[in-house]
């Protein structure tokens, strides 16, 4: 028996599009208005800083000769497909999980676009305290982390709340 897309978690795919538009739009603005390494202070402890990441989180494997571009692209595609299948198999009313999956897919696809189009991921958010700087990241990374945090949060909810 087939089910309506609107009755499945795929109903939340609109959030993937929103994440992609915001992420790719922010990266476009950085690429059009910043030279590599440019920094603009926004608030105390927060800068816009144009950086290129040829690896993964914290520049993992950034200096590995180029193969990592395709490796991380494959991971992004695989995770996106897996989460889309999970959304299809879940009910649209399971909001927390589906929102989490959509955020992760949107972030993964945003960074995938960068890897395939530019050969690197555009990063621009520089959080710091004093002289200590956290790794520069982007809005796709933020969406992925928020999605992962929602999945962890869902694990702590009582069973009754999960069945909604």
From Swiss-Prot:
Identify the PROSITE patterns for this entry. Answer: SPASE_II
What reactions does this protein catalyze?
Release of signal peptides from bacterial membrane prolipoproteins. Hydrolyzes -Xaa-Yaa-Zaa-|-(S,diacylglyceryl)Cys-, in which Xaa is hydrophobic (preferably Leu), and Yaa (Ala or Ser) and Zaa (Gly or Ala) have small, neutral side chains
Pfam families linked to this entry:
Peptidase_A8
Q: Which InterPro entries match?
A: Peptidase_A8
Q: Which residues form the active site?
A: 123, 141
Q: EC class of this enzyme? A: hydrolase
Q: State its location(s).
A: Cell inner membrane
Which key words tag this protein in UniProt? Aspartyl protease, Cell inner membrane, Cell membrane, Hydrolase, Membrane, Protease, Transmembrane, Transmembrane helix
Q: GO CC: one term?
A: plasma membrane
Mode of membrane association: Multi-pass membrane protein
* Chief subcellular location: membrane
**Where on the tree of life does the source sit, at the highest rank?**
Bacteria
Q: In which pathway does it act?
A: Protein modification; lipoprotein biosynthesis (signal peptide cleavage)
Q: What is its EC number?
A: 3.4.23.36
Q: Tell me the Gene Ontology biological-process terms attached to this UniProt entry.
A: proteolysis
Physiological role: This protein specifically catalyzes the removal of signal peptides from prolipoproteins.
Q: Which family does it belong to?
A: Belongs to the peptidase A8 family.
HAMAP family registered for this protein in UniProt: LspA
State what protein this is by name.
Lipoprotein signal peptidase
Which organism encodes this protein?
Shigella flexneri
The gene is lspA
